[in-house]
């Protein structure tokens, strides 16, 4: 295995080249001057299926991609927070919703975007919700009223379906991508 170099304080533009470091099998960004390897890793997305009784919280996106489409409160995990703390933060940022995390619902791998999504099952502490800066509007939906044709991403549909199939069960298995599905959608929409 190649010797691990410490991160340079500031790497001047253009000093990294893409190559397979000695002892590795993947193409990496390697500093030409010091040999530091800048590992590019998947991004972690955290979110939750939040409920108030039988109703599910959805947020209509005010940002791209998929502006105007409905999603779960979710977003990128921040440094120095747990995944559950990130899911709580995202619920507040997108829907001004205070939630109690109940249990991990699903883990999805979105290969095209190099994402790992951790989706929790959560309970709203109050039905008082409001659109945050990244949402046009928010709403509580009965299962039959979910705007399925306007769902933003395949993983949102998967999470909702898994939540519905696990409803009332404490021992449900953690969900994952449906066989052969990797979360592709039309990014230009």
List where the protein language model places each region.
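Nudix hydrolase/Nudix homology domain
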Residues: 1-5, 133-189
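N-terminal leader/linker segments that precede catalytic domains of diphosphate-processing enzymes
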Residues: 1-66, 76-93, 97-128, 169-189
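Short capping/connector residues at structural and topological boundaries
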Residues: 49, 75-77, 82, 110, ...
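Glycine-rich active-site/cofactor-binding loop and its immediate structural neighborhood
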Residues: 71
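Hydrophobic alpha-helical segments
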Residues: 74, 87, 114, 120, ...
